[in-house]
């Protein structure tokens, strides 16, 4: 928990600060803006911040694939208000999709992001060796974000 908290506390404070700056304009937030802010703050700008983020995502990948009830409770207890605010903004950005579906799509998106970033070093090596294409984290995130946005915007049909 302490490891997650060292990453999540500054991350959640930065997100809260960004959202607070919106003031009364929260209802005008677009999906692209919301996800872009989350990703930019999670990844950071410096090489050190990016390395730290990749370590966090590797740990998150381990936690995500195992039943970690204590971590789920920890996140719920410590970051519930921020997640509820995020979900409210998501609902405003995509009013045609029910909140329960947005909750699921958030988990699908998180899974995609975690899987991609926890294996970034391997993906970088494969891309270089097999395709002669060096990948930087910024380029991967630049391509990952539209993929995640498309997942959120996928048509909803009650099944």
Q: Where are each of the predicted segments found?
A:
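A short secondary-structure junction motif
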Residues: 10-14, 18, 63, 67, ...
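Hydrophobic alpha-helical connector segments
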Residues: 13-56
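Short linear capping/connector segments at secondary-structure termini
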Residues: 20-21, 60-62, 126-130
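Amphipathic, well-packed alpha-helical segments that form the structural scaffold of globular domains
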Residues: 12, 16, 39-40, 61, ...
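An amphipathic alpha-helix adjacent to DNA-recognition modules
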Residues: 1-20, 24, 28, 72, ...
């Amino acid at each position: 928990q302490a490891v997650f908290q060292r990453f999540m506390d500054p991350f959640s404070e930065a997100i809260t600060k960004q959202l607070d700056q919106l003031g009364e304009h929260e209802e005008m937030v677009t999906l692209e803006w919301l996800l872009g802010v989350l990703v930019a703050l999670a990844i950071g700008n410096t090489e050190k911040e990016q390395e730290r983020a990749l370590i966090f995502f590797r740990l998150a990948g381990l936690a995500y694939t195992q039943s970690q009830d204590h971590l789920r409770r920890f996140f719920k207890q410590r970051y519930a208000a921020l997640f509820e605010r995020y979900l409210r903004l998501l609902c405003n950005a995509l009013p045609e999709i029910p909140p329960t579906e947005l909750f699921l799509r958030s988990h699908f998106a998180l899974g995609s992001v975690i899987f991609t970033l926890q294996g970034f070093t391997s993906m970088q090596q494969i891309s270089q060796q097999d395709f002669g294409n060096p990948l930087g984290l910024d380029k991967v995130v630049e391509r990952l974000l539209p993929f995640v946005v498309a997942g959120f915007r996928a048509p909803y049909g009650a099944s």
